[in-house]
Amino acid sequence: MQNLNDIPPSQACTFFTETQVDIAKRVEKIITSDLRQHHPAWELAAQFSVSETSLKNYFRGVFGQNISIYLREVRMKKAAELLATTRLSVAEVAEQVGYMNQSKFASVFKKQFGLSPLEYRRSKNLEN
């Protein structure tokens, strides 16, 4: 996962204009500012007056992966942090990172880290 917030747009990607890179960065900021919120690509595209396809291309070009994969990785990283540093329940962690279905959250988490959320927490020595 790349963090390009400190890179000038002109250096972030040579294939896109400064405006296109700026749109991608602004989209990244929107989708990661509150992980509980869901922002459909078509809605974001309309907000920036570009097509959904263009928006997805800008994002992939700047961040190296599509919006949904990027967001899933950010959500899982935040979930791992919460599991390791708080005593929130797995259900609360799932909700904090945008999953209303705890089972789906646990499945995605295990696929990402190779451990269930509770196993991960135990491995970080914070079991209740």
Regions from the PLM with identified roles:
Residues 1-13:
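An amphipathic alpha-helical interaction segment
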Residues 26, 38-71, 96-119:
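Basic/polar phosphate-binding segments, predominantly the helix-turn-helix DNA-binding elements
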Residues 71-80, 119-128:
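Short, basic, alpha-helical segments at the C-terminal edge of helix-turn-helix-like DNA-binding modules
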Residues 83, 95-96:
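Active-site pocket scaffolds in enzymes
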Residues 90-94:
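Hydrophobic positions on the alpha-helical face of helix-turn-helix-like DNA-binding modules
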